Amino acid sequence: MESTSKFTYRGYTLEELRQMPIEKLAEIMPARQRRSLLRVFKQGTSEEHLKLLEKIRRAAKLASEGKKQPVIKTHLRDFIILPEMVGLTIHVHNGKEFVPVEITPEKIGHYLGEFALTTKKVEHGEPGLKATRSSMFVALK
């Protein structure tokens, strides 16, 4: 028997979260995200954040109508993922290129930058001749 669990964020379902105003949503988020949300949306200090939110709302409206969603690109790595963004793909800049980030309900409350890594794992090759002291005694090919 398979049990399907509904997604909840701090006791609220996704539909309840989508209906909440940003001020109410900020109250249930952790302190760091709450301060960031209120600073951006209550004081209106960042025009870039508000422009991105408008783009997201337009894309969500098109997606609900069944039309093709436009590509949303942003450099705002400090933008908090909101419930209305679920289902969209946002391309986040990692310093070199735009990395597509598929927004799922589990990502609500996180920053966009968390999902577009700025560094990649270093993969070293084989050491060459004279790379170490011990290779001085290796026979040449």
UniProtKB/Swiss-Prot annotation:
Give GO MF terms, alphabetically.
rRNA binding; structural constituent of ribosome
UniProt keyword annotation of Thylakoid present: no
**Where in the sequence is the signal peptide annotated?**
none
Q: Which InterPro entries match?
A: Ribosomal_uS19 (IPR002222), Ribosomal_uS19_CS (IPR020934), Ribosomal_uS19_euk/arc (IPR005713), Ribosomal_uS19_SF (IPR023575)
Q: Does this UniProt record's set of keywords contain Zinc-finger?
A: no
Please indicate which superkingdom the organism of origin belongs to: Archaea
| Cross-referenced Gene3D superfamilies | 30s Ribosomal Protein S19, Chain A
Q: GO CC annotations? A: cytosolic small ribosomal subunit
Q: Provide this UniProt record's keywords sorted from A to Z.
A: Ribonucleoprotein, Ribosomal protein, RNA-binding, rRNA-binding
Any one GO biological process: translation
Give the protein's biological function.
Answer: Protein S19 forms a complex with S13 that binds strongly to the 16S ribosomal RNA.
Q: Which family does the UniProt entry place this protein in?
A: Belongs to the universal ribosomal protein uS19 family.
- Please report the name of this protein according to its UniProt entry: Small ribosomal subunit protein uS19
